[in-house]
Amino acid sequence: MARKGLIQRENKRQKLEQKYHSIRRSSKKEIRQVLSLSDKWEIYGKLQSPPRNSAPTRLHRRCFSTGRPRANYRDFGLSGQILREMVHACLLPGATRSSW
């Protein structure tokens, strides 16, 4: 189980990313349209003004039940350990164990 503070920090980053997403997208679109170099530098400065934690690269997928940051399956939102336990307990419909 991940510490509560790490999970809260990740939730805060998600909210910040949603808040500043439109600003980042519009300034990136402006950079592609502007031709003069000095204007581009001004827009780059504006792009650097939002907080660092609002960048989408700072986000990390976490397990829905445990908060584990590694070995996550996107389809289920679970880590590999929990996914395996739930499949063995028949809690995930449509998921089958491999046996050969």
Swiss-Prot record:
Q: Where in the cell is it found?
A: Plastid, Chloroplast
The record's GO CC annotations read: chloroplast; small ribosomal subunit
- For this chain's UniProt record, which GO biological process terms are given? translation
What is the protein's quaternary organization? Part of the 30S ribosomal subunit.
Give the family from UniProt.
Belongs to the universal ribosomal protein uS14 family.
Q: What does this protein do?
A: Binds 16S rRNA, required for the assembly of 30S particles.
Protein name stated in the entry: Small ribosomal subunit protein uS14c
| Organism encoding this protein | Daucus carota (Wild carrot)
